[in-house]
Curated annotation (Swiss-Prot):
Record EC number: 3.4.11.4
Enzyme active site: D80, E173 (proton acceptor)
Listed name of the protein: Peptidase T
Matching SUPFAM superfamilies: Bacterial exopeptidase dimerisation domain, Zn-dependent exopeptidases
Subcellular location as annotated: Cytoplasm
GO cellular component: a single term: cytosol
One biological process term in Gene Ontology: proteolysis
Top-level division of the source organism's lineage: Bacteria
Length: 410
């Protein structure tokens, strides 16, 4: 498979789990280790303009092989894996010619079952790369990295026409910092694609508007034996606060274009409690209303408290729906759709119920929709990717590059 699988297996051997709440970028040393290994690989493969920034963003270029002017385009993937599940000592399992039924993950009781994951019914006969049940796999987004590099290596060998192609591998995407230090001007592409999606055919240019909501609740602790009229239990207030958040609008109750409120963490004592929510909505007006709801709940629950006891809400916008930017450049989507169809893939246009580096970059002047990788069930032990899906992603990347050149030909 032209080293595609070998590349992927090599990349997932690096522990690149990012870490929230860390000021430095990248947030973990493992990401820099992978970046340096990729830098060396790109040098050996003959790529040009290879730059590794101090924040761990690796960029490189494949120069045009045609005489006419072609818009420079880019392909981007991220090096980190989710902080929500271990990415250390990943031990991939390779199952060729999947015949259906449960797949044992390692030697324990963990299985990958089509009962829980019906998509497996569509993958009979495919080669599946799974976890051993102890870690995530890292197809999000090391499959994307392997696909981009493999596609460009094949482009060089095939002599298919293409213009200048830029590539970038970013750190800390999973914690929302992937594009924070991305130099759009130096990248010098007219548009780009993140290769960070899921199943074959996924093409995404809509994502959530996102905000982080910190709720600080200050109570008053006294001996419970003499607490009447004096104690203000911050934990009780925290419970009341959460009871006012619409239960039917949680992640486990929503899908498609529905937004949600998600209680991500809570901790506390009688004296103080802290709740962390994330709020998401595709519609900008709905997004603003959700943030206002969080403020309104605080006002309602905190009404009548002693001045020394209070509920404080801090809201920080994280990213916005890139549709606002990408839909101004419809040819970018049309190009990707045509490339997929040319590769016998029917595009599956769907909203991203999350975010990507592309969301940030689109608002920095680099329109950047998202392409599939062939992976499934990200951020956990049931994550897997198909080799056939990865091969199709490689083909689509190559076809996008070729079509861009052909359409620019005088």
């Amino acid at each position: 498979m032209d080293k595609l699988l070998d590349r992927f297996l090599n990349y997932v051997s690096f522990d690149t789990q990012s870490k929230s709440g860390v000021r430095q970028v990248p947030s973990t040393d493992g990401q820099l280790k992978l970046a340096r290994a990729l830098q060396q690989e790109l040098l050996e493969l003959g790529f040009e303009q290879i730059v590794l920034s101090k924040q761990g963003c690796l960029t490189a270029a494949l120069p045009s092989n045609v005489a006419w002017s072609v818009p420079a385009i880019g392909f981007i993937s991220h090096m980190d894996t989710s902080p929500d599940f271990s990415g250390k000592n990943v031990n991939p399992q390779i199952l060729e010619n999947y015949r259906g039924g449960d797949i044992a993950l390692g030697v324990g009781d963990e299985v990958l079952s089509p009962v829980m994951f019906p998509v497996l019914h569509q993958l009979l006969g495919h080669t599946l790369i799974t976890t051993d049940g102890k870690t995530l796999l890292g197809a999000d987004d090391k499959a994307g990295i392997a696909e981009i590099i493999t596609a460009l290596v094949r482009l060089k060998k095939s002599q298919l026409p293409h213009g200048d192609i830029r590539i970038a591998f970013t750190p800390d995407e999973e914690i929302g910092k992937g594009a924070q230090f991305f130099d759009v001007k130096a990248f010098n592409a007219q548009w780009a694609y993140t290769v960070d999606g899921g199943g074959v055919g996924e093409l995404e240019y809509e994502n959530f508007n996102a905000a982080s909501v910190q709720v600080k609740i200050v109570g008053n602790n006294v001996h419970p034996g003499s607490a009447k009229g004096v104690m203000v239990n911050a934990l009780t207030l925290a419970s009341r606060y959460h009871q006012h958040v619409p239960e039917s609008e949680s992640p486990e109750q929503t899908e498609g274009y529905q937004g949600f409120y998600h209680l991500h963490s809570m901790k506390g004592s009688v004296e103080r409690a802290d709740l962390h929510y994330i709020v998401r909505d595709f519609d900008r007006n709905g997004f603003e209303q959700r943030k206002q709801t969080m403020l309104d709940i605080a006002e309602k629950v905190g009404a009548g408290l002693h001045p020394d006891c209070y509920i404080e809400v801090t809201i920080t916008d994280t990213y916005y729906n890139m549709r606002e930017q990408v839909e101004q450049h419809p040819h970018i989507i049309a190009l990707a759709q045509q490339a997929m169809r040319d590769c016998s893939i029917e595009p599956n246009m769907k909203p991203i119920r999350g975010g990507t580096d592309g969301a940030h970059l689109s608002f920095q002047g680099l329109p950047c929709p998202n392409l599939f990788t062939g992976g499934y069930n990200y951020h956990g032990k049931h994550e897997f990717v198909t080799l056939e899906g990865m091969e199709k992603a490689v083909s689509v990347i190559m076809r996008i590059a070729e079509l861009t050149a052909l359409r620019a030909k005088p």
